[in-house]
């Protein structure tokens, strides 16, 4: 795509929301991932339920789902969409890294990549917020789109 072909600019080179009126509704799915690194003790306390603010993973899961539904309120040119599925899962390395994965699905005229990315980002920020009293050095890294399906551009899978 050429610079002049960017779709979020009008004829005056000012920002606009893309017109999706004539696009067909199709099933669209996106998976995103983010990893938060922390001290071993922090991860152990999360799993043991010994964080003062509560069940970290349950709260982060709900925060991620809420974020997916609110993405258009945070990202200026994102269309409001009807999210038909939003799920957050967690996997850790048993030491210091906790990976957050989101899956977001819709049947609509525009994709859900931003919703999936927003979901993992907010889930990671929620974990940071709930654990920062004991570990201010946590790092949120490697936030990326893992896969997307549906729509005119078809399927995308990130390189491993």
UniProtKB/Swiss-Prot annotation:
It catalyses: (8S)-3',8-cyclo-7,8-dihydroguanosine 5'-triphosphate = cyclic pyranopterin phosphate + diphosphate. CDD domains: MoaC_PE (cd01420). Its EC number is 4.6.1.17. It is an enzyme of class 4 (lyase). Catalyzes the conversion of (8S)-3',8-cyclo-7,8-dihydroguanosine 5'-triphosphate to cyclic pyranopterin monophosphate (cPMP). GO terms for biological process: Mo-molybdopterin cofactor biosynthetic process. PANTHER family: CYCLIC PYRANOPTERIN MONOPHOSPHATE SYNTHASE, MOLYBDOPTERIN COFACTOR SYNTHESIS PROTEIN A. One of its GO terms (molecular function) is cyclic pyranopterin monophosphate synthase activity. This is Cyclic pyranopterin monophosphate synthase. Pathway: Cofactor biosynthesis; molybdopterin biosynthesis. Homohexamer; trimer of dimers. Keywords: Lyase, Molybdenum cofactor biosynthesis. InterPro entries: MoaC (IPR023045), MoaC_bact/euk (IPR047594), MoaC_sf (IPR036522), MoCo_biosynth_MoaA/MoaC (IPR050105), Mopterin_CF_biosynth-C_dom (IPR002820). Coiled coil: none annotated. Belongs to the MoaC family. Pfam families: MoaC (PF01967). SUPFAM superfamilies: Molybdenum cofactor biosynthesis protein C, MoaC (SSF55040). The active site is at residue 129. It comes from Listeria monocytogenes serovar 1/2a (strain ATCC BAA-679 / EGD-e). Substrate binds at residues 77-79, 114-115.
């Amino acid at each position: 795509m050429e610079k002049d072909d960017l779709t979020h600019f009008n004829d005056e080179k000012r920002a606009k929301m893309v017109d999706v009126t004539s696009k067909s509704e199709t099933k669209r799915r996106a998976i995103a991932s983010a990893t938060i690194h922390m001290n071993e003790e922090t991860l152990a306390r999360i799993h043991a339920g010994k964080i003062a603010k509560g069940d970290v993973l349950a709260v982060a899961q709900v925060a991620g789902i809420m974020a997916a539904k609110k993405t258009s309120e945070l990202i200026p040119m994102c269309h409001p969409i009807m999210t038909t599925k939003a799920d957050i899962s967690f996997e850790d390395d048993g030491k210091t890294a906790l990976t957050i994965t989101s899956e977001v699905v819709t049947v609509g005229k525009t994709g859900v990549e931003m919703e999936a990315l927003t979901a993992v980002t907010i889930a990671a920020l929620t974990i940071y917020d709930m654990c920062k009293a004991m570990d201010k050095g946590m790092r949120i890294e490697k936030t990326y789109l893992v896969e997307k399906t549906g729509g005119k551009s078809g399927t995308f899978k990130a390189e491993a």
